[in-house]
């Protein structure tokens, strides 16, 4: 068994099921950091719930639930992380100079409502000369999409700008379930009825929208026809994007023709009826293969982008992904990495991933099947590793989130963030 080398983590800051106590530990560690540094750190913003000791109505946040990271992103230069948590907190972490140091927020602020989805600008960095790219998008139910500042100098975090989500046909707010920057000054949003909406950062109203079918859907079909995720392009100016849905449909999005093109569905993917939607789309670095990660599934589907996205292979997991999403990462150095329910990391090597999950043919014999290349132990046994993200500047550094199963009442729950070296 291989073992990763832990570089940083959040220690026990988010352990347990007491949100107020976790905030208290976080504040104490931030004070220790400030006292031992000559740098002037921005003061951590407090939550309304912390200021009132939880005496305000808590119709959204459960103060006895574990604090879990729901979105984790690197800055483009690999010097910092942005993490969005289910306590409504947005935290920015600068990687410490000394290994083994606890991760303490450089900056923290709280939103007034939970985020359905969010994404940071692809050029974000705390070391940018300008704050133009130090922004993130966040969607919530019954609210416009909000553009929020991630500037280290920002003292207030009211939205910089808002984007309309009103359906022109019925004048109701549409919930945007997925967000992704499509280029430096525009983004895509995915909603119900398989609709993709495109925005320019400088305009309130959408610039175009398109859906992925010709006939209206009703009932259960309509509720599950939701754009659940977009691919993560390596080229921010790409004119071709891809989207998955909770019905396990996959679409190509041509930003030039402003149309969605059907690529695959539950039938062509040969999925069982209880498969509950696409959680992530990852392309191999050579763009030949699309890896499809699904909820309520024990396999990762491999589609051939050169052959009409036909399914050509499956990668088998040692566990079943449930309703709580698990987010993997893929890069040229590490190949495909995904966390497990018991604190391990599975790896399919790059030379396998770039050949559709098969080891390339050798003079001694044909291509070999898609078994896991390595299994890594971590320091987080007993917790699920629910997010992995490789550093854009040093892919050997992998950031991740670990947490308990949010649907189980485990009062010894351990949660937090880590950075490990593979």
Curated annotation (Swiss-Prot):
Superkingdom, taxonomy of origin: Eukaryota
GO annotation, cellular component aspect: nucleus
Cross-referenced SUPFAM superfamilies: Quinoprotein alcohol dehydrogenase-like
InterPro entries given in the database record: Quinoprotein_ADH-like_sf, SWT21/TCAB1_mRNA_Telomere, WD40/YVTN_repeat-like_dom_sf
Keywords attached to this entry: mRNA processing, mRNA splicing, Nucleus
BP-aspect Gene Ontology terms: mRNA processing; RNA splicing
Location in or out of the cell: Nucleus
Similarity section: Belongs to the SWT21 family.
Its job: Involved in mRNA splicing. Helps to stabilize the U1 snRNP-5' splice site interaction.
Subunit structure: Associates with snRNPs.
PANTHER family in alphabetical order: TELOMERASE CAJAL BODY PROTEIN 1 (PTHR13211:SF0)
Protein name, per record: Protein SWT21
């Amino acid at each position: 068994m291989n073992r990763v080398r832990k570089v940083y983590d959040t220690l026990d800051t988010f352990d347990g099921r007491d949100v107020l106590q976790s905030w208290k530990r976080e504040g104490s560690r931030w004070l220790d950091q400030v006292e031992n540094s000559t740098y002037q750190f921005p003061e951590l913003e407090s939550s309304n719930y912390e200021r009132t000791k939880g005496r305000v109505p808590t119709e959204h946040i459960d103060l006895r639930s574990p604090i879990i990271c729901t979105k984790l992103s690197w800055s483009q230069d690999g010097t910092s992380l942005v993490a969005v948590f289910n306590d409504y907190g947005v935290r920015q972490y600068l990687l410490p100079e000394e290994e083994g140091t606890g991760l303490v927020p450089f900056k923290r602020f709280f939103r007034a409502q939970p985020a359905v989805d969010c994404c940071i600008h692809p050029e974000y960095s705390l070391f940018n000369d300008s704050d133009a790219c130090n922004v993130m998008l966040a969607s919530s139910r019954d609210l416009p999409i909000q553009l929020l500042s991630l500037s280290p100098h920002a003292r207030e975090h009211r939205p910089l700008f808002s984007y309309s989500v009103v359906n022109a046909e019925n004048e109701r707010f549409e919930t945007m379930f997925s967000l992704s920057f499509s280029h430096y000054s525009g983004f895509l949003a995915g909603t119900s009825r398989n609709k993709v909406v495109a925005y320019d950062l400088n305009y309130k109203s959408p610039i175009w929208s398109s859906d992925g079918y010709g006939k209206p859907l009703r009932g259960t079909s309509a509720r599950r026809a939701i754009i659940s995720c977009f691919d993560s392009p390596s080229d921010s100016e790409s004119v071709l994007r891809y989207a998955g849905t909770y019905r396990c449909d996959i679409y190509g999005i041509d930003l030039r023709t402003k149309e969605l093109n059907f690529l695959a569905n539950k039938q062509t993917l040969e999925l069982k009826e209880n498969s509950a939607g696409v959680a992530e789309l990852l392309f191999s670095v050579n763009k030949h293969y699309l890896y499809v990660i699904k909820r309520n599934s024990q396999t990762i589907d491999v589609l051939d982008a050169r052959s009409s996205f036909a399914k050509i292979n499956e990668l088998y997991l040692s566990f079943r992904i449930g309703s709580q999403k698990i987010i993997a990462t893929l890069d040229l150095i590490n190949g495909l990495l995904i966390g497990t329910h018991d604190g391990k990391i599975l790896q399919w090597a790059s030379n396998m991933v770039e050949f559709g999950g098969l080891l390339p043919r050798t003079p001694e014999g044909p291509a070999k099947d898609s078994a896991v290349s390595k299994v890594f132990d971590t320091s987080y046994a007993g917790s699920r590793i629910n997010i992995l993200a490789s550093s854009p500047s040093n892919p050997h550094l992998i950031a991740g989130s670990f947490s308990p199963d949010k649907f189980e009442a485990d009062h010894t729950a351990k949660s937090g963030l880590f950075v490990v070296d593979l």
